[in-house]
């Protein structure tokens, strides 16, 4: 993942240390977050003598990564092989702490990685594409076949490198509101925006027209810049 010895590396879900060992060979210390206490003795055994490993037994979805960055004295680099069932919620959780995270190297099921890196108008484009794309630069760096794992899963995996942009792709007045607008637009995928955004605004058609966006368009056709502009034009 291109880390330097002095980097503050946090590994989420190290399991039995398949990634942890090579990481410890590259950096001075690794901070690992592992919920499954049954794995900890084997993890410690397999990484003994390689480097300094700190392990916290906690649910990553409950971790305040801003606090972790303050404690470790600088921006974090996150490394993780994410279980499919928590990959989207965890990514959205990490996104909240973007000011404290310089970059992330994450392994997802291929389908999720493609959604994150998707362009407007493509089938995979959705909430994750827009929210990540505003603040992060996403690039699929590697695809991993099922045969790389024991037991092999039924799907391909992909490694995604997410680097924080120097500035958001488009100016956003209220980040929380932007997130709500994006969720609203994609909440009912096949609906046109004037219908999909009814939950957010008493007069969605007027709001869209005020933003210069055709109310008959669907969420998957809007660029990240258009989403930002739409959110900025919101007046309840």
Language-model features: where?
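An accessory alpha-helical subdomain
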Residues: 158, 162-164, 170-204, 214, ...
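Short, amphipathic C-terminal "tail helix"
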Residues: 213-236
């Amino acid at each position: 993942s291109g880390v330097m010895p002095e980097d503050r590396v946090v590994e989420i879900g190290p399991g039995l240390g398949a990634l942890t060992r090579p990481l410890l060979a590259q950096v001075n210390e690794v901070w690992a977050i592992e919920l499954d206490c049954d794995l900890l003795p084997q993890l410690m055994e397999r990484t003994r003598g390689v480097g300094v490993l700190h392990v916290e037994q906690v649910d990553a979805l409950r971790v305040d990564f801003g606090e972790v960055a303050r404690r470790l004295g600088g921006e974090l680099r996150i490394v993780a092989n994410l279980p499919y069932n928590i990959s989207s919620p965890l990514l959205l959780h990490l996104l909240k702490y973007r000011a404290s995270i310089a970059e992330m190297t994450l392994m997802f099921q291929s389908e999720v990685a493609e959604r994150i890196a998707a362009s407007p108008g493509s089938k995979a484009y959705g909430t994750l594409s827009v929210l990540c794309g505003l603040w992060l630069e996403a690039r699929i760096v590697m695809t991993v076949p099922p045969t790389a794992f024991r037991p092999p899963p039924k799907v391909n995996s992909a490694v995604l490198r997410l680097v924080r942009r120097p500035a958001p792709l488009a100016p956003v007045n209220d980040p929380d509101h932007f997130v709500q607008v994006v969720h609203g637009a994609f909440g009912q995928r096949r609906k046109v925006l004037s219908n999909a955004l009814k939950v957010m605004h008493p007069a969605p058609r007027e709001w869209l027209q005020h933003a210069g966006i055709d109310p008959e368009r669907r969420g998957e056709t809007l660029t990240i810049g258009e989403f930002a502009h739409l959110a900025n034009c919101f007046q309840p």
